[in-house]
Amino acid sequence: MDSNTIRIFSFCGGGTKGYGSNRFMKKFIQQWGIPQADLWKYADVMCGTSIGAILASGYSFGKTQDEMESFFTTYAKRIFTIRTATDIATGSHNASQDSYRPDLLSKLAIIATNDSFYRSAYEDSNYGHNILQQVLVSNFGNSTLANFKTPVVIPAYEEDMKRYVVFSNFNDPAYFIGNNESIVNVCRASSAAPVYLPAHNFNGHYYSDGGQYANDAILAAINIGLTVKPNANRIVIVDVGTGIGNMSFDGSGTETGLEHTAVRLFGIMNIAMTGSEEWSRYYLDYLSNRLALDVYFYKFQPKFPVDFANEIDNSTTAWFTQLSNLIDTHYTNESDKIASILTHLTA
């Protein structure tokens, strides 16, 4: 790559809707004409939050979009499922059904106990966060951030210290931590969505989802890009969102005041997470169109129809098929913009 251009790829959080982000990248890479496993060779910096952290880690580690797709189509249904009443009554440690999600009242009951929806009940349980841990280990083993092939930025929240942190393999301890931390731990930290998955504990600290404050880590990625390529005069950014919609309780079937309150609170969380993405979009759009800087920016961010199930723990085959169709339609509708950013990437 030339030394005059900084190329950045950002992947936002959104749970299983990250399947759409990976599908976008699969189509984008195919249109670009480069091997799937070689994306890192064409990126100066990658960043990601929550599921975006897992995608950015995979791509920077040399994983293909086909490989990352199995995270959703094969394993999500076991991460986002719980034990049935029969499973519990019979004393089973395991969940007998795929994609068996708690309903709204059950979720409220779990929240009331300060627990997470998809916490595995036992260390040997075949569902929940145990499966997330197993899948990450099978993909990254004991590798650390230092094994990434390109600089990566991953935000998380350090709960016990009430501190916002940014993990990176870029060595600048004044601004980043975890250069030699395991990829598994960092991905678990950034993807521990409150109430959905338990906070992840390592090195004496508890971490939860970076999407609580930085669902799009693009600004930190730009800073690293400017540092590793101080003489660059062009910045090209591909920022991949998981779509705009209701990321949590949809409010259907609510009857009590408590239920309506829960819907409202989770709606606010949705606004906060999506809002951080849209604020980054606003900043970068202004930067590229109004200031005398050579910045080229594309945001892939489909707007989902009101009848689409947008909660971040959907995982059925039918749902992934529906999401795939929506992504394909948006990709087609954005063909001119996508062709334009590819021109700048390859210039």
Regions found by a protein language model. Give the residues of each.
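Patatin-like phospholipase
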Residues: D2-C12, T16-L136, F176, V184-C187, ...
